[in-house]
Amino acid sequence: MDDTKLNLIMRCFDSLKIKMTEEELSTFILDNDFSNADIDAVMRMFTFLEKRNNEASIQMMLRLSKLPLKSPKTFENFDFSQVHGKNVSQLEGLQSLSTLYSHKNVALIGPAGTGKTHIAMAYGYECCQHKLKTYFIKMSELND
């Protein structure tokens, strides 16, 4: 039996919260005389289920975040060439979410029309892509 296929199936089980040990899976495969094609089919099915579950989680995070979903603001569709200053590289580095993981605050300060809201939305969108809870609200809505 191919260890990498077994490891992939086990990773899917873990992601899908299916409680089965590697030994139990191996025993099940051997007891039921699974062929290599059978194991491939099982692997593809659980990989598909894991991907579908992951996508559903991301969509739920996006819905709960209150970010606009029709035309999402992302780092990919932000024009960094329009930003000037000495900390532009830090702004481009926000996509890695390293500030979040290092427990640092991010303040976006500047005049109107410079892309602060776009960057905030892109940051929230990226958090949702990593299944992190996000809630987007504009400053003007805080006053209400």
State each model region's role.
Residues D14-K70:
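Interdomain "pre-motor" coupling segment immediately N-terminal to P-loop NTPase/helicase cores
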Residues K73-L97:
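N-terminal pre-Walker A segment at the start of P-loop NTPase domains
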Residues S89-Y101, I109, Y123:
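P-loop NTPase catalytic core of nucleic-acid-dependent motor ATPases
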Residues Y101-H103, H130:
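Short loop/turn elements that form and flank the Walker-type P-loop nucleotide-binding site
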Residues H103-I119:
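Walker A/P-loop nucleotide-binding motif
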Residues G124-I137:
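Post-Walker A helix-loop "phosphate-sensing" segment adjacent to the P-loop in P-loop NTPases
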Residues I137-D144:
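A short hydrophobic beta-strand->loop->alpha-helix junction that borders the nucleotide-binding pocket
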